[in-house]
């Protein structure tokens, strides 16, 4: 559905302009006379929602399809976990379809307590929600049980509420060791992985010698299969060593894990399809994001799975026609952790300001995230691949205090020719110039706003311009980290 251009007063309209700047070297806007407040200062108590506003929120949530998905549209860290946590209250099942402990989802409970999850689905805070780890995920059992122990120590019951696919692959500690050795081997060309062993584990899956959760039911052959993996790693990497004693200790550890994991192990393909037949409501929680997709991302600076819409089907074993609404989560600016192209990256003071104000440090690694303006070209590319029905714009409050904000609306070659699609060529991506549209910023604290019409006019202009450029409506707007800090549009 087309969007009408937002109405502005003449002064605001005059403030919008276009500019060309080289990729990764965009000139930051002039600093504000008063520096934007910290995220902590922005966390004020939410105002009580009006009755019409509550009705709007209820309408948005109740209109979602039986099977819906929440996927990232950038390079991860968009804030998917918060939306999943909120939506989970209306769903019977929340499922992870791919990835592993490289995905860091930060959520807050009703008391404001922070939880950082990596493998357990974000729906776990909702006591009536069943959580599923699908066949497309890779499971590091020491980390999995550490998460469960942490949740239960905080009063969140996990017993009988988490199902793990018997087809999911097991990620071992040695995979993490190999991940680090691989990065060292790459030297200056390193990919910048989380070193959580994701790539090596998926590599074993693809060459068909990996161990799956179902192998824990056959501990008599488990040791021999694990020995094959360890031997291959030792042959491949000079710095990798293991002994018969190491193998024995690992097998003994997994014998205990097998006993503890037993109640969780399920044929989740059957469970998911039966749940669909029973009209259960299912919410799929994507890890990472489309720009990290093994096929569609900035290869080779990508993850080893498919965090796009296609990964839902292959990672859970459900049919494409069963999937309805897909919500794309996009930060109001762009961030990236690790190496790889980043056309709208800000290397100056504005990038530092966004990092500090947005608390942009990786949930999984703790590394500072690279920051830049919202990349509309990349966003449209992700929308094209996934077919999103709506968007969740997060962290709009972080832009408060900037005199002007920019949208990267086009890529151009060095000679000024506009590029029609998102390039696969990394050399081209590193050389492109970004065409920016400049919009006026806002000074008002928006962290307590819960009604779209109460946002500053220029903040609404920013949201509506994104809708107009992408052609997809923004239904949810994040203005803070808490559960309640969400505007339903």
Curated annotation (Swiss-Prot):
IMP binds at residues 77-80, 102-105, 194, 208, 288, 303, 367. The active site is at 77 (proton acceptor), 105 (proton donor). Residues 1-45 form a transit peptide. Pathway: Purine metabolism; AMP biosynthesis via de novo pathway; AMP from IMP: step 1/2. Keywords: Chloroplast, GTP-binding, Ligase, Magnesium, Metal-binding, Nucleotide-binding, Plastid, Purine biosynthesis, Transit peptide. Disulfide bonds: none annotated. It catalyses: IMP + L-aspartate + GTP = N(6)-(1,2-dicarboxyethyl)-AMP + GDP + phosphate + 2 H(+). PROSITE patterns: ADENYLOSUCCIN_SYN_1, ADENYLOSUCCIN_SYN_2. Belongs to the adenylosuccinate synthetase family. This is Adenylosuccinate synthetase 2, chloroplastic. GO terms for molecular function: adenylosuccinate synthase activity; GTP binding; magnesium ion binding. It comes from the Eukaryota. Mg(2+) binds at residues 77, 104. It comes from Oryza sativa subsp. japonica. Its cofactor is Mg(2+). Homodimer. GO terms for biological process: 'de novo' AMP biosynthetic process; IMP metabolic process. Its EC number is 6.3.4.4. Substrate binds at residues 363-369. InterPro entries: Adenylosuccin_syn_GTP-bd (IPR018220), Adenylosuccin_syn_Lys_AS (IPR033128), Adenylosuccinate_synth_dom1 (IPR042109), Adenylosuccinate_synth_dom2 (IPR042110), Adenylosuccinate_synth_dom3 (IPR042111), Adenylosuccinate_synthetase (IPR001114), P-loop_NTPase (IPR027417).
